[in-house]
From Swiss-Prot:
Keywords from the named record: Cell membrane, Membrane, Repeat, Transmembrane, Transmembrane helix, Transport
Keyword Cell cycle tagged: no
Lineage start: Bacteria, Thermotogati, Thermotogota, Thermotogae, Thermotogales
BP terms from Gene Ontology: glycerol transmembrane transport
Similarity field: Belongs to the MIP/aquaporin (TC 1.A.8) family.
Membrane-spanning segments: 3-23, 36-56, 82-102, 134-154, 164-184, 214-234
Record-given protein name: Probable glycerol uptake facilitator protein
Gene responsible for this protein: glpF
Length: 234
C-alpha cells in the first residue's frame, strides 16, 4: 500500500471515530446525547490509537500535518514527502467528516443548536481570544510531539506504542483541551470544517473561517517546537 493512501485511510478513520464521538454526544436523540467531555476525550484518544494501529507500519501514521512537519524539521522525515502526506491527511479528514455526516443523517434536523452542529466537525474556542487560543494550540501540540517522540524511543513496547499515543491524546484533551477543543492537528480541523461548509446540513451556521487559522498555525508552530525541544534535550 502507498504511504499516501495509508495516511488518507488513517486520517479518515481518525475523523470517523473522533468526529463520530462528538456527534454522538452533541446531536439530539443520539444514544450518547449529553454524555459529556470525558466521553469525547476518550473517543478521540481511542480514535488516534486505532488509526495508528491501522497504518503505523505502512506510513508511520502521522495522520497530522503538525507531526509530519515537526519530524521533517528535525531531519526524521524527508521534506519531499511532506506535501503528499499533508494532502492525503486533509483529504482523509474531509472524507471522514462526510461519513460521519451520513451516519448521523436524521439527527441534524433534530438538533436546533447550529454551534453544536459545527462542533461535530471542527474546533472552536470557549473564550475567543486569538492570542490565548493560539498559545493553547501551540502548547498542546508541543506536548503531543514530545510525547510521541518519547513513546517512539521506547523500543521495549513497540506493540503498545499506538495505545500509548492514544493515552497521550486522551490526557491532552482532559488537561489542555478546555480552552479550544484541542485541535492539535491542522488536518483534523480544516478538512471537516471544509466539509461543514459544503454539506447541506439543515440549520447550520457559517463555518467560522475567521477562527480557522488558529488550529492550523498553532499546531504547526507547536509541532516544530515540540520536535525541536525533544531533539535538543534527548
Amino acid at each position: 500500500m502507498s504511504v499516501y493512501l495509508a495516511e488518507f485511510l488513517g486520517t479518515m478513520l481518525l475523523i470517523i471515530l473522533g468526529d463520530g464521538v462528538v456527534a454522538n454526544v452533541v446531536l439530539k436523540k443520539s444514544k450518547g446525547h449529553n454524555s459529556g467531555w470525558i466521553v469525547i476525550t476518550t473517543g478521540w484518544g481511542l480514535a488516534v490509537a486505532m488509526s495508528v494501529y491501522l497504518v503505523g507500519r505502512i506510513s508511520g501514521a502521522h495522520i497530522n500535518p503538525a507531526v509530519t512537519i515537526g519530524l521533517a524539521f528535525i531531519g526524521q522525515f524527508p521534506w519531499s514527502k511532506v506535501p503528499g502526506y499533508i494532502f492525503s491527511q486533509i483529504l482523509g479528514a474531509f472524507v471522514g467528516a462526510i461519513l460521519v455526516y451520513l451516519t448521523y443523517l436524521p439527527h441534524w434536523k433534530e438538533t436546533d443548536d447550529p454551534d453544536a452542529k459545527l462542533a461535530v466537525f471542527c474546533t472552536g474556542p470557549a473564550v475567543r481570544k486569538y492570542g490565548a487560543n493560539l498559545l493553547t494550540e501551540i502548547i498542546g501540540t508541543m506536548v503531543l510531539l514530545m510525547g510521541v517522540l518519547g513513546i517512539g524511543a521506547n523500543k521495549l513496547a513497540d506493540g503498545l506504542n499506538p495505545l500509548l499515543v492514544g493515552f497521550l491524546v486522551w490526557s491532552i484533551g482532559l488537561s489542555l483541551g478546555g480552552p479550544t477543543g484541542y485541535a492539535i492537528n491542522p488536518a483534523r480541523d480544516f478538512g471537516p470544517r471544509l466539509a461543514h461548509a459544503i454539506l447541506p446540513i439543515p440549520g447550520k451556521r457559517d463555518s467560522d473561517w475567521s477562527y480557522s487559522w488558529v488550529p492550523i498555525i498553532g499546531p504547526i508552530i507547536g509541532g516544530i517546537l515540540g520536535a525541536s525541544l525533544y531533539n535538543w534535550l534527548f
